[in-house]
């Protein structure tokens, strides 16, 4: 009987200890919404307190430049790990023509930097948001506005996406992205003249590669990603030729695209460590 009572007491103590551990876990912070412009989509949801000890991280969602996608869960996840997270929306192709999307991201980065007392933020973008993230890190003097950039499945070359989507046997996702890229450019390479080609060239992050003036880059795809790893390989090669040494590419197993890449083995840990190292 005594042994039974001791066992019950021990189980109760373990359950109490486990409950205390759960209660002590950090609570994901709620977000506060701010506007960085007059348009309804020009807003930022901030997670986590502002502090000199918390690096700022700007998140740019994907959605083929045509729709919003929800990154609030990951924003809270990063905030719980010591970042002040700025989950940023921007005008879509239904709202305004290119380069409005890039203009919005640059305006948002200026707003964040002002709020952070002049400190440059880190940037994390996914898919179409990855395209805007690498644009932010390469357009002009990217390093002056973004401390470093992580891009998950970045559509670094919308023209490549357009060409891949028109190839025989192209997947549904690639065909859809082809149409989205053409809507972003506002013209078809098949029919457009010099102005059209200039816009497609401007859309390619590699066209803006300037080496040491640009932000460090971590570019991640999966082997079966419908946004092929060649997007990032081309950008990385252009940056290395221009003199940027801090550029890394990763290709992981599977067919994950964008945000779900963070759920693949080691990618979450690699991304978090890289961001912290560049804070």
Tell where the protein language model's regions lie, with residue ranges.
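Active-site glycine-rich loops that stabilize anionic/oxyanionic intermediates
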Residues: 54, 61-66
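The serine-hydrolase catalytic nucleophile loop
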Residues: 66-76, 90, 231
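Alpha/beta-hydrolase active-site loop
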Residues: 96-115
């Amino acid at each position: 009987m005594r042994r039974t009572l001791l066992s019950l007491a021990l189980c109760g103590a373990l359950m109490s200890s486990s409950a205390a551990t759960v209660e002590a876990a950090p609570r994901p912070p709620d977000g506060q919404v701010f506007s960085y412009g007059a348009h309804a989509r020009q807003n930022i949801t901030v997670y986590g307190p502002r502090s000199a000890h918390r690096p700022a991280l700007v998140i740019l969602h994907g959605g083929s430049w045509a729709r919003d996608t929800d990154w609030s869960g990951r924003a809270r996840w990063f905030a719980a790990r010591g970042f002040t997270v700025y989950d940023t929306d921007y005008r879509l192709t239904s709202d305004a023509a290119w380069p409005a999307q890039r203009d919005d991201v640059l305006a948002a980065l200026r707003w964040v930097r002002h709020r952070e007392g002049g400190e440059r933020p880190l940037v994390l973008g996914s898919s179409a948001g990855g395209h805007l993230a690498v644009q932010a890190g390469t357009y002009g003097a990217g390093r002056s506005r973004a401390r470093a950039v992580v891009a998950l499945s970045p559509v670094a070359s919308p023209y490549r996406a357009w060409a891949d989507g028109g190839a025989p046997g192209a997947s549904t996702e690639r065909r859809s992205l082809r149409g989205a890229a053409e809507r972003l450019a506002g013209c078809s390479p098949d029919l457009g003249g010099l102005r059209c080609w200039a816009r497609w060239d401007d859309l390619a992050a590699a066209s803006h590669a300037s080496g040491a003036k640009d932000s460090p880059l971590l570019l991640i795809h999966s082997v079966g990603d419908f946004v092929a790893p060649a997007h990032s390989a081309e950008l990385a090669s252009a940056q290395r030729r221009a003199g940027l040494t801090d550029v890394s590419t990763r290709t992981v197993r599977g067919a994950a695209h964008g945000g779900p890449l963070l759920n693949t083995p080691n990618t979450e840990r690699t991304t978090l460590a890289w961001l912290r190292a560049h804070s």
